[in-house]
C-alpha cells in the first residue's frame, strides 16, 4: 500500500509522535509511507525514521480546502491508497480529498479525550480508549477501532545513552535527592491544572527529601507555569522546580527520573523506561499505577477525573511521600509498568492492527446513500461548532485544545480489565 500520514502538527506532542512512530513501523513492514504536515521540530524524527516528508500549505484557519486540494493532488500523482489524518482538522481534510476518488480511502485517528461530532460517522475512526469507543459506537459510528497509543519499546527503555549527565549539568539537577519528571505540552486544557498542583505538591514535601520536579515541555501556558515555578523556588530557597522547555529528545528526562507523572502517550513512555508512574488527570486526579489500578486505565485511558481541584496537590504529595523513600517499591512498580508496555503497547503489534484498518477502509463494500446523509449530519455539527467557537472568541472563553477541554471520563466498572490483561 501507499499511505500518507498527516499529524495535526509537528511540534513535540504525544499524538504526533505516535503518528510518526507508527508510520515508521508500517514503512518497515514494506509499505510506502509519506508524512504530510506543517513543518516543525518533529520533521527531524520523520527523516531519522527514513520517511519522506511533504510540507502542507500554510493556511490561517483549519480545516483548510487548500490543504485538502494539496492532499488530493498528491494522492492522484503518487497513486496513494490511504490518507490518514490524526485529530479532527487533518481528518476532515483527508476526507474531503478522498471523497471523490473511489480508489483512495480516508481514515481518522483521534487521540484527544473526546471525538468531534462533525467527523463523518461512516469515516473509519481509531480512538485510544475503550471508553471513548463505546461512547462513539453508541452515537452511531459504524467503524470504530481501539488502538491504544503505541510505544517503541526498543527506543524507549532503560540503559540507553541519552546524555543524561548533560541534562543534569545543563539544568543543575543534583545526583543526590529525588527527581520527579513530567514530559508534557504546556496546554491550558487538560494539562495546566495538574502541572501547577504538581509544583505545589513537591514544594510541600519535607526539605530533607531534596525533591526536584523536572518539567520538559512548552506551550501556550508557559507563562503561568514559569510564574508558579519561580514562586515555588523562592519559597523553598532552592531549585525545586526545573522548567527545561521543549527538549528535542525528551527521553533523557524520563530516564533521570525516580518517579514520573503524566497522561496518555507520555505516561506510557515513562513506563517503557521502567519508572513508577503517577497518572495525571483533571479535578485533582492523581493515581499511582499498580496491579490493582491497571484495569481502570485500560478502560478509560491514562487519565482520570477527580472530585475537585482543591485536593490535587495533597493527593499527589501523599503518593510521593510514600513511594520516593521506598526504593524496593519503586523498583517493583517500574518493572511492572515496563511489562505492561512490552506486552500490550508494542509498536509492532500496533502496526499490524493499523494495516488491518487500512485494508478494511479500502474494501469497496459501502453505502453511498448512507454516506450522503451522514455527511449532511456532520456538516450540521460542524456549523454549530463554528458558531460556538465564534461566540467563545467574542466573549473571551475560547480554548485551543477544544475537544481535550470536554473529555469523555465517566465512571464505569472495570471488571473485564484486570492486571492479567497486561499479558
What residues fall within each predicted segment?
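Conserved donor-binding/catalytic core segment of Leloir-type glycosyltransferases
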Residues: 4, 151, 166, 174-192, ...
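Short His-centered aromatic/hydrophobic patch
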Residues: 85-91, 110
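Donor nucleotide-sugar binding/catalytic pocket of nucleotide-sugar-dependent glycosyltransferases
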Residues: 115, 122-162
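A short helix/loop element that forms part of the nucleotide-sugar donor recognition site in Leloir-type
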Residues: 157-173
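Nucleotide-activated donor-binding/catalytic signature segment of Leloir-type glycosyltransferases, i.e.
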Residues: 226-247
